[in-house]
Amino acid sequence: MSDPEMGWVPEPPTMTLGASRVELRVSCHGLLDRDTLTKPHPCVLLKLYSDEQWVEVERTEVLRSCSSPVFSRVLALEYFFEEKQPLQFHVFDAEDGATSPRNDTFLGSTECTLGQIVSQTKVTKPLLLKNGKTAGKSTITIVAEEVSGTNDYVQLTFRAYKLDNKDLFSKSDPFMEIYKTNEDQSDQLVWRTEVVKNNLNPSWEPFRLSLHSLCSCDVHRPLKFLVYDYDSSGKHDFIGEFTSTFQEMQEGTANPGQEMQWDCINPKYRDKKKNYKSSGTVVLAQCTVEKVHTFLDYIMGGCQISFTVAIDFTASNGDPRSSQSLHCLSPRQPNHYLQALRAVGGICQDYDSDKRFPAFGFGARIPPNFEVSHDFAINFDPENPECEEISGVIASYRRCLPQIQLYGPTNVAPIINRVAEPAQREQSTGQATKYSVLLVLTDGVVSDMAETRTAIVRASRLPMSIIIVGVGNADFSDMRLLDGDDGPLRCPRGVPAARDIVQFVPFRDFKDAAPSALAKCVLAEVPRQVVEYYASQGISPGAPRPCTLATTPSPSP
């Protein structure tokens, strides 16, 4: 029985958006010798491209006289799926006390994105000199690993018996508080149980909280447990306390049916009473850890992001030969379709191993018979609509425009259903191997809104997300209904979407911003949607691919 006056510590949300922390482990092979007598003293400097400049974020230790170093110091970064996060790895010789790569100390460098590293788990690249040529046979290997444990949850069940009675005319009303010890040795409240009225042998309700909340993911961090007798005045009577760690709690309940117990000690009584033993006993009846999988768990476990593009070729875009057309191919400035393609596709392609993307058009009359189609391959190869990388999608788009007649209406359901077909096959495997993301670029209101709602509701039960970017200055108010931010989307028959899978953004909100701003906005929801889908299906990530840096240790620094 709980009391509203107690101000219970709320349970944290099950899933939070934001960054994951990634650790990069680095090794090099075959570094160039600066002279014939000595081997280099290598160090790797990591830079991140941020705010239009390269900024040093981490560096390894220096290893002495080693041409194939395996560095022990990890390079830690915050990872965001929706950001490009370009990285540079600079290798230099620190023999003469150098702290940065100069011409005389530079051994080579390489560039890649953090997304490329985490999607492949292990990346090996040649080192390049400043003139762009390879540094002999020198290579650098980077292995990514997510910092684990930060998303795990703990289920705990406590009871107590023979607690001291603090009430004159009735029994105590016990509750318990749990505190963790911070780095500065202060105590922070992490949980407060409910009050059990008039009972010296209380059984508190099971509760669940994140491992981060309980002990900051440090199983050795001291935990303090305080038991009180509740008083409505707020002056609760102290019964006793004990200390433990999460590791001790796990070990004490490791076997089925095994429980752990502590004496509940009141230090004042212990110091004053010679025969004092305890003020009761507290028992931990259950301690289980629930692994909450993250987006990176699925990506590093082999899940690929299958990216498909759908482009609106309806007449409302305007004649492509006109400078006022949304499809105008100006040599000076890429149109909004191209800008959105590059911004969003440039990130998604890092998560697809073959980097081949199906690209479709809708709302145009197409050769040879110039009949209206709402899901035609823009490379005009219906048997193989895939394009090589985003640059291939852009090239196909440019070749396609002069060959088609912009028409209408703006029907989106056919392309959603087309992408849903392979997603349906993927669902039947029961594995987390491929998640589909459909990018729809359109200039106006959807004509087949009822059919589109039905298609989205169906797709919400599949491993699939939909990103809609509105191009131009049309009224997109109806499009926002598909987003589901104001409540679950329903099909015309009233069936609700199983989850929110649509993100709609008008491009005009970002036309004066950096391209990365659009990508950040439209892709921010994808990691949550991926995790939500697989969690709802009870599908765990695949085992991370085994990665090793080297078979022999480097010389000591």
Swiss-Prot record:
GO cellular component: axon; clathrin-coated endocytic vesicle; dendrite; endosome; extracellular exosome; membrane; perikaryon; plasma membrane
Region (Linker region): 244-303
Keyword Membrane: yes
Location of this chain's protein in the cell: Cytoplasm; Cell membrane; Endosome; Cytoplasmic vesicle, Clathrin-coated vesicle
Record keywords, A-Z: Calcium, Cell membrane, Cell projection, Cytoplasm, Cytoplasmic vesicle, Differentiation, Endosome, Membrane, Metal-binding, Repeat
Tissues expressing the protein: Widely expressed in the brain. Expressed weakly in the kidney, liver and fetal heart. Expressed in melanocytes.
One GO term (biological process): cell differentiation
Principal cellular location given in the protein's record: cytoplasm
Binding residues for Ca(2+) 1: D167, D173, D229, D231
Ranges of residues in domain VWFA: 306-526
Keyword check for Transcription: no
Cofactors, names only: Ca(2+)
TM stretches of this protein: none
GO MF annotations, alphabetized: calcium ion binding; calcium-dependent phospholipid binding; phosphatidylserine binding
Sequence ranges assigned to domain C2 in this UniProt record: 2-127, 134-263
Annotated Ca(2+) 2 binding sites: D167, D229, D231, D237
Record comment regarding domains: The C2 domain 1 binds phospholipids in a calcium-independent manner and is not necessary for calcium-mediated translocation and association to the plasma membrane. The C2 domain 2 binds phospholipids in a calcium-dependent manner and is necessary for calcium-mediated translocation and association to the plasma membrane. The linker region contributes to the calcium-dependent translocation and association to the plasma membrane. The VWFA domain is necessary for association with intracellular clathrin-coated vesicles in a calcium-dependent manner.
Subunit structure: Interacts (via second C2 domain) with OS9 (via C-terminus); this interaction occurs in a calcium-dependent manner in vitro. May interact with NECAB1.
PANTHER family: COPINE, COPINE-6
Functional summary from the UniProt entry: Calcium-dependent phospholipid-binding protein that plays a role in calcium-mediated intracellular processes. Binds phospholipid membranes in a calcium-dependent manner. Plays a role in dendrite formation by melanocytes.
Family statement drawn from the similarity comment of this UniProt entry: Belongs to the copine family.
Designated name of the protein: Copine-6
Record lineage: Eukaryota, Metazoa, Chordata, Craniata, Vertebrata
